[in-house]
């Protein structure tokens, strides 16, 4: 088994269960889970230079452009150069993937393919704690008190773009941007696609895939 540092990426539309899969990979294999959404929230909260630039776009209801997200992630990855890591939410576009290429070779890419109806159902049951980014699902990860964050006691919200009428457009945007990224990694032989409606069914295959690349830190598979 290679002793080099593992560089992994997870791709998937909103509601695909990326966060859950990432947590399990981090727990079982000791990879640093680096979420672009989480890092963006941290930078917005602490008013960093890149956070202030991103805020200008978000306040106008615009997507944060590639060059801002890329700068945010490159800065974080520089500090993680001695660690195994797993990227979540980056790269989302071909421009971002090409920027990542300039600093490292990606060893492993997972793409989660979930049927639209499943995504719609999941997201209609999804509630967020805005300041931390904690995600709850009323079916399989409900808060202890309905509508309230477990840790802070602050109210949970449902994002506008999780609502069914916004989801189709959001999914189309994801697919359009992700298609060339998926093709790029497929052409390099590092892409592994998983289809299904249940994270627990996909997980054993993901676990086996990572076990072939890196020694688990748990003697037993953790769920």
UniProtKB/Swiss-Prot annotation:
Statement: the UniProt record of this protein carries the keyword Kinase: yes
Ligand binding (AMP): 36, 41, 62-64, 89-92, 96, 170
Principal localisation: mitochondrion
Annotated stretches, region: LID: 125-162
Chain positions with N6-acetyllysine modification: 175, 179, 186
Tissue expression as described in the entry: Expressed in the pyramidal cells in the hippocampus.
Family according to the record: Belongs to the adenylate kinase family. AK3 subfamily.
Protein name according to UniProt: Adenylate kinase 4, mitochondrial
Naturally occurring in which organism (per UniProt): Rattus norvegicus (Rat)
């Amino acid at each position: 088994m290679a002793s080099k540092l593992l560089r992994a990426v997870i791709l998937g539309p909103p509601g695909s269960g990326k966060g859950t899969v990432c947590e399990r990979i981090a727990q079982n294999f000791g990879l640093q889970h680096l979420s672009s959404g989480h890092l963006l929230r941290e930078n917005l909260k602490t008013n960093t230079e890149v956070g202030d630039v991103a805020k200008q776009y978000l306040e106008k209801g615009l997507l944060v452009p590639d060059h801002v997200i890329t700068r945010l992630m490159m800065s974080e990855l520089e500090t993680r150069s001695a660690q195994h890591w797993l990227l979540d939410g980056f790269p989302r576009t071909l421009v971002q993937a090409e920027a990542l290429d300039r600093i490292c070779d990606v060893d492993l890419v997972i793409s989660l393919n979930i049927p639209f109806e499943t995504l719609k159902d999941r997201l209609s049951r999804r509630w967020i704690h805005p300041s931390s980014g904690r995600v709850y699902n009323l079916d399989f990860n409900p808060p202890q008190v309905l509508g309230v964050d477990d840790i802070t006691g602050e109210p949970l919200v449902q994002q506008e773009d999780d609502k069914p009428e916004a989801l189709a457009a959001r999914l189309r945007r994801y697919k359009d941007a992700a298609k060339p990224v998926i093709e790029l990694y497929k052409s390099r032989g590092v892409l592994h696609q998983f289809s299904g409606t249940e994270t627990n069914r996909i997980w054993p295959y993901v676990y086996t895939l990572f076990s072939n690349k890196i020694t688990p830190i748990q003697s037993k598979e953790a769920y």
